[in-house]
Amino acid sequence: MKPSLHVGNTADVHMLVTEDMCPAFDGIVVHQVYSTWSMAHHMELAARKVLAPHLEEHEEGIGGHLSVDHLAPAAVGATVRIHAEAIELNGDQLTCEVTAWEGATLLGRGQQVQRVLPKEVLKRIIDRAARRSDEKGRDGT
């Protein structure tokens, strides 16, 4: 990681809640609100934006942990801001506190951890996972 990455670095992601961000099970939308999984995705994205500018050319980040407490709903059409802040750097790990806001209303909070690896190490890990999948067959048997 570049020395420019510090505790306190931040990034924000802004989005308009759309119907494709609503919770749906078996293709049926159950609520016209921002889903927990959409919030989790946007929290990952904001945390990635904290890390990405500070990666060396030979490095890549990989997610290791995400916790989300979904505290309040946001309706379709609402503007949501996800804020990520680096709160801990420990060797090759970055921990971000992530929060989701609609105006002054706290919608959610959590933590996201990314590990920074050399790209060739990550490629070996992914290749090993692909081989496991090929050995089992794509249907998991």
In which residue ranges do the predicted regions lie?
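Flexible, active-site-adjacent loop/turn segments at secondary-structure boundaries
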Residues: E19-P23, H31-Q32, P53, E60, ...
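A generic structural signal for short beta-strands and their flanking turns/coil linkers
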Residues: N9-V13, M39, I62-L66, V76-I82, ...
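Catalytic strand-loop segment that frames the active site of acyl-thioester-processing enzymes
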Residues: M1-S35
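Generic structural detector for well-ordered beta-strands
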Residues: D12-T18, D69, Q111-R115
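HotDog/MaoC-like acyl-thioester-processing domains
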Residues: A75-V76, A86-T141
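Hydrophobic beta-strand-centered segment that forms part of the acyl-chain substrate-binding groove
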Residues: A47-R81
